[in-house]
Each structure stands twice: as C-alpha cells, then as structure tokens.
C-alpha cells in the first residue's frame, strides 16, 4: 500500500444508468476500481442510486446523491468530496455541484452524455411508432422490476421512461439550461468548456474523458458501417464479453444518426466537459468502468490505471 491516490477529500464514485454499487450485491459496478484506489491510499465511497430515474426532481438521482454526499461528509469529517461519475452519473454529479457547490471540490465525468445519447433518441423514436402505446408501458414495467432486482438495496425508486427521457439529446439540452456549468462548451460546437468553475464562491475542478472504440467506416447506400477499434482479429472479448458486440451494434445506430465516433452509447462530442484528459481510449461504454468483469479488447487501455492516475492528479491539485 502507498499514498499515490491519497487525496485531501474523499472520492465518491457515481454509477450510471442501470447501475448500483454492487449488482445483485455480488458484482461491483466499478469493477476492481474501489479496491485498487484504496490500496493506493484513497478514501473511496461508492454511491448507490436508482438505476433508472431522472437526475432532477424530488425522487431524482441528484437528490439521492446529495444525501449520500452528506452521509460521507458526516462519516469522514471532510468538508468536501471529489465526484467521479460514469455515464449518467456525470449528470448526477453536476446536479450536486450546482445545488450544493460548497460540498464539492471536483467533478470528473467518464463517458457522460452531457449532450444526450443518439441511442436514447433512437429508442424513444421506436417506442413512438407503436400505435397502442403499450410497448413503452410494458418495457418500462419490465425494466423497473429489473432495476429493483439488480439494485443491491432492492431500490424500488425506478422510472425507466424518465431515465430514457433524461438521456435524449432534447432533454439534456433542457438540463444544461437548468443546471449550467462552465465546463460545457457551446451547444453543437463539439468543444469543451472551462477547466474550472466557481459556483456560489466555491471553486470546482472539472475533468472528463471517454472511450471512442466505435468508429465509422464506409457508407454504402446511405448506411454507414461501424467498427470496434478496441478488439483485434479473433478477439476473446467478442466471445467472453457479450456487451462487446452489443455496443458495436448500438454504436452503429448512433453513427447513422450522425453522432460520429462513440463508445456505443455516448459520442465523443457529448462526453466533452472541463479539462479533457483524452477521448482516444479504445473503450466501449462498459470498458470505461472495467466491465464486464475486467474483460476488454486487445487494443483497450487499462481503465483501472487511468482512474488511479486521475485520482493522483486530484491529489497533486490539492483536492
């Protein structure tokens, strides 16, 4: 053990859509990440929020995270926290930074759809094509039950349709107006914003990174192909990790909705926030948190090492 990742303030890892701290109380969402950081001296807490819910509103993930932040501060005696959010967890972290700025030292977002996800738009469009409207009700009921089952605390505060709406490009534009951040560039610019923000007299350090394993290939008859640059020929990840091929398929849908390069669910442009560490990691959306179970393509970087290096970066910044 050493003090490489021993930050001044505790670190809170904030999960995304469909997440929990431990799936069914067995498998860590942030696979192998909490224990790695702890072995390098970090105080790390893992939030457990609704897997399917919006970020704002009284039942939202934002208020759940705010309550958890206050618990961590009470338990540790610290005055602030460093928030690290994956996927929707980055939007949730921004909520807390906006409404309780004095409790936050930094916000880091990993594969976060700050501008929404073209795949969420696609799913919403597909559900709209059902004239009965039953499919969205049935799917939502199923997903809500799934969310409760996999949640380590069997959290019943699940609303799949609210979660889907939250992640659309239209709804995130509204969210960004309601919870603005200096870390965001101008809408539609595919640029990031400032590396720091001051909210109510409190300074926040802002960082992001994301995977762009899914890249567009040639266009034939108006349909653009997609390739997964994280995997090699006959890559074991295609066999042992079912999410690998699934996220190539969703990434292809995104590319054909003009997302550009992406991680299967979030485009490079959508992930940009604060100081961008990199957008060239050969990761899909789950590789970013070392899932499934640590399996990744032959070309993929080690996400555990990237997060460890970043927590050391926070330490060197004095937070």
Swiss-Prot record:
Signal peptide (from-to): none
Cofactor(s) this protein requires: Ca(2+)
Biotechnology: Found to be superior in improving overall detergency.
Superkingdom field: Bacteria
Gene3D superfamilies named among the record's database cross-references: alpha/beta hydrolase
GO-annotated molecular function: metal ion binding; triacylglycerol lipase activity
GO cellular component terms, semicolon-separated: extracellular region
Active-site residues, as the UniProt record annotates them: 87 (nucleophile), 263 (charge relay system), 285 (charge relay system)
Family of the protein in this entry: Belongs to the AB hydrolase superfamily. Pseudomonas lipase family.
Function of the molecule: Catalyzes the hydrolysis of triacylglycerol.
Name listed for the protein in its UniProt record: Triacylglycerol lipase
UniProt source species: Pseudarthrobacter phenanthrenivorans
């Amino acid at each position: 053990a050493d003090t490489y990742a021993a930050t001044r303030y505790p670190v809170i890892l904030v999960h995304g859509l469909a997440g929990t701290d431990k799936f069914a109380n067995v498998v860590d969402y942030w696979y192998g990440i909490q224990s790695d950081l702890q072995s390098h001296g970090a105080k790390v807490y893992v939030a457990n929020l609704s897997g399917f819910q919006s970020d704002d509103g009284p039942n939202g993930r934002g208020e759940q995270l705010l309550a958890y932040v206050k618990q961590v501060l009470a338990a540790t005696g610290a005055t602030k926290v460093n928030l690290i959010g994956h996927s929707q967890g980055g939007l949730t972290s921004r909520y807390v930074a906006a409404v309780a700025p004095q409790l936050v030292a930094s916000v880091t977002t990993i594969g976060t759809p700050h501008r929404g996800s073209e795949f969420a738009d696609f799913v919403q469009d597909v559900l709209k094509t059902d004239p009965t409207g039953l499919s969205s009700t049935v799917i939502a009921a199923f997903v809500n039950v799934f969310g409760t089952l996999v949640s380590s605390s069997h959290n019943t505060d699940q609303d799949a349709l609210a979660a889907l709406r939250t992640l659309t490009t239209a709804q995130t534009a509204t969210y960004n107006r309601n919870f603005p951040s200096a870390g965001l560039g101008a809408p539609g610019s595919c640029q990031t914003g400032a590396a720091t923000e001051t909210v109510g007299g409190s300074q926040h350090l802002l960082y992001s990174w994301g995977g762009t394993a899914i890249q567009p290939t040639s266009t034939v008859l108006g349909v653009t192909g997609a390739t997964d640059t994280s995997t090699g020929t006959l890559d074991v990840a295609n066999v042992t990790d079912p999410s690998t091929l699934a996220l190539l398929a969703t990434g292809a849908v995104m590319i054909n909705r003009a997302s550009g390069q992406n991680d299967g669910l979030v485009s490079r442009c959508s992930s940009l926030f604060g100081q961008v560490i990199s957008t060239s990691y050969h990761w899909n959306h789950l590789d970013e948190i070392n899932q499934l179970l640590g399996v990744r393509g032959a070309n993929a970087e080690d996400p555990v090492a990237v997060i460890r290096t970043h927590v050391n970066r926070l330490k060197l910044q004095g937070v």
